[in-house]
Amino acid sequence: MRQQQMRNIGIMAHVDAGKTTTTERMLFYTGKIHRMGEIDDGATTMDWMVQEQERGITIQSAATTVRWREVDITIIDTPGHVDFTAEVERALRVLDGVVVVLCAVGRVQPQTETVWYQADRYDIPRVCFVNKMDRIGADFFSVLDQVHNKFGIDAVALQIPIGSGTSFEGVIDLITMKEIFWDAASSGEQMEYRPIQSARIAQAREAREKMLDVISIYSDEVTECVLAGEHVPVQLLHAEIRKAVRERRYVPFLCGSSRHNLGVQPLLDAVVEYLPAPQERKAVEGFHVQKKEPVFIAPTAEGPLLALVFKIQYEREAGLLCYVRMYSGKLRTGDSIVNIGKKKRERVYRILRMHSNKSETVECIQAGDIAVIVGLKSAQTGDSVGDGSCPVVLESMHFPEPVISVSLEPMDASSRDKLQETLGILSREDPTFSVREDAETGQLLISGMGELHLDVLTTRMREDFNVQVRVGKPHVTYRESIRKTVERTLRVQRVIGGKEYMAGLTLRVEARKRGAGNEFFCQVKELRGTVCTAHTAPAEIIGAVEHAIRGAWDGGIQSGYPCVDVGVHLLSVEYQELTSSPFIFEAAAVQAFGEACVAAEPYVLEPIMSVELSCAQENVGDVMNVIIQRGGIILGMDSKHGRELVHAQAPMKKMFGFSTDVRSASRGGASFTMRFSHFESCA
């Protein structure tokens, strides 16, 4: 019953669509805060980091819980900037519903598409809120059309705006057929419902008919009412929309202006009415590590304990905070739990509910809850934890590869150890941040999703960890892969410390589909040796080979860049009990892998970026020339409100300093977004 009174939602959008402002209003109207902060003042509740307040953007996802109409709503506010898309990915993995905030002027923007497809991957129901209806050029219906055309799903207006731009003053609710207005003197807390004015009744009836047309496609009861010419009851509409949203038949749309305190309470109503409670979602799929088979876990508090760690955050006093989503069972302070993948047992010191960067200690959480555990020293993002009675590993998360690197060194030698510790914490927090040492120069290299991403991280090193560092110029992070399939058999004999060691194995390396990732397959059918029979090689030997291959992927083939999309099959093993050991098999595996990959025609890949650029019509030729001169390809153009939108792709290695050239070519009148698209063979 408690789960029915819960919602776990995310607020997601393209940068500057008004996502954090919308969340701030939600906190105010639910009574969670008593004064609304503004982004321009660096005073919003969910943007608590100094870097967020200084830059006016969300960098880290932040969680809070509010209460609306007797329902507890856990809200995760996520970044809108492409450099921090990992924060969106891990939030979506554990959410039951999403509010997508769209700008009424900008409409569907690049990061809107990214988060939409991320939500599709996890099959998450959503409602949409068209914000900034007060802006000049706002067009509610164009946003709906663009969503329908881009994503192939019906966009159903549950409201229509009264006016737009500077004349926007309220909405018409098509469910109740009432006009809604907000009192500015009460900061929008007081709402007034009025009959629809005669001048607007025809438009409202037409919009309601369109809404009912879509709803009736998926509801026999609504169809019967419409055909009989009867009034469709409000509660029936709520129930049928809720069912259709849960099944992702269509997406309901609302509108408003969060900055001017218009439209947020109906959005909260929509979250309660239409987005699913935890137990209304499908049973979560996992993999039983003992039975070696997929299993489905029902979201019930009476089941075995099972939770997913979806975020790690360092806190100076508490240490590592592990954000978890509870999928089954109950967890209490002091309980002993098992990290299922790592087979490590640890004790829960404290359980916290977060309100941005503040916390409240609780004694118990259960299925459906999102909370923080303190005390898990070995946990990483994507780990599954349980009580040990049900050893099930849940699906983890997919994170994009870092595409840009900078060299890093401490300002003084005494800070070297502290820098290493800091990098360890940051890389544990952020799965898209990696650290490695250049094999040729010995330089320390850090890699991330973009210049802003790395700038934020190096600023945190200085300000949060008091580590002064010298940062080199950014350069592109390349990858290596192979074109052919090659087998290699290798037998290694070495004498170490007067003792002879032997290892023999056969590997096959193969090129995988772009984006498929690296994968290790153990296909040992025959094990040759003086004591072994088929399938009797010790598990530590197979594990040593896999461990060595995973390390070899990171080390690259010829150029030292990490490997992508390379499959490795272990076909056979020659093992002798007295002369074979894991370390000699690791050496053999690395050598065999390297020789096979060299023969498999290795090549280097570079990151290609998607660019969307907006400029005045008179500047479009000059702006396109800037892209073409940097090796870019123009994919298409659109016109919007007298401005031209240029869609292009370009190699990242040629995009450093792009913003300066674009400003010059457009005389300061252009803006652009750039995000990673894919890796492609270097020309």
From Swiss-Prot:
Residues 4-279 form the tr-type G domain. One of its GO terms (cellular component) is cytoplasm. GO terms for biological process: ribosome disassembly. It holds the Pfam family EFG_C. Disulfide bonds: none annotated. Gene3D superfamilies: 3.30.230.10, 3.30.70.240, Elongation Factor G (Translational Gtpase), domain 3, P-loop containing nucleotide triphosphate hydrolases, Translation factors. CDD domains: EF-G (cd01886), EFG_III (cd16262), EFG_like_IV (cd01680), EFG_mtEFG_C (cd03713), EFG_mtEFG_II (cd04088). It is found in: Cytoplasm. GTP binds at residues 13-20, 77-81, 131-134. SUPFAM superfamilies: EF-G C-terminal domain-like, P-loop containing nucleoside triphosphate hydrolases, Ribosomal protein S5 domain 2-like, Translation proteins. The keyword GTP-binding applies. One of its GO terms (molecular function) is GTP binding. Keywords: Cytoplasm, Elongation factor, GTP-binding, Nucleotide-binding, Protein biosynthesis. SMART domains: EFG_C (SM00838), EFG_IV (SM00889). Catalyzes the GTP-dependent ribosomal translocation step during translation elongation. During this step, the ribosome changes from the pre-translocational (PRE) to the post-translocational (POST) state as the newly formed A-site-bound peptidyl-tRNA and P-site-bound deacylated tRNA move to the P and E sites, respectively. Catalyzes the coordinated movement of the two tRNA molecules, the mRNA and conformational changes in the ribosome. Belongs to the TRAFAC class translation factor GTPase superfamily. Classic translation factor GTPase family. EF-G/EF-2 subfamily. This is Elongation factor G 2. It comes from Treponema pallidum (strain Nichols).
